[in-house]
């Protein structure tokens, strides 16, 4: 199970990742990229890593929507 703390850390990671990075990867590569960055910040056991992998996969449409919204906002402010 993904703990609330892990969720907060993941979403902070998504917010701190450049939009171009979030949009450049295919789905499976983006999951692995985010998981690798998460593990670099905090050690997690293999079972939690699997839960987090599944959670990220389920949230990919939302992650991409957020990235696209951030991109539109950034382009609109220039």
For each feature predicted by the language model, list its residue ranges.
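Amphipathic alpha-helical interaction segments
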Residues: 9, 29, 33, 51-55
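Polar low-complexity intrinsically disordered regions
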Residues: 14, 30-34, 63
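Intrinsically disordered, low-complexity regions
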Residues: 19-22, 41, 49
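DNA-recognition alpha helix
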Residues: 33-41
């Amino acid at each position: 199970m993904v703990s609330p703390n892990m969720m907060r850390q993941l979403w902070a990671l998504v917010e701190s990742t450049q939009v171009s990075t979030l949009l450049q990867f295919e789905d499976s590569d983006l999951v692995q990229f985010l998981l690798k960055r998460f593990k670099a910040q905090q050690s997690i056991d293999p079972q939690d890593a699997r839960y987090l992998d599944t959670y990220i996969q389920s949230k990919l449409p939302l992650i991409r929507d957020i990235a696209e919204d951030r991109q539109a906002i950034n382009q609109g402010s220039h």
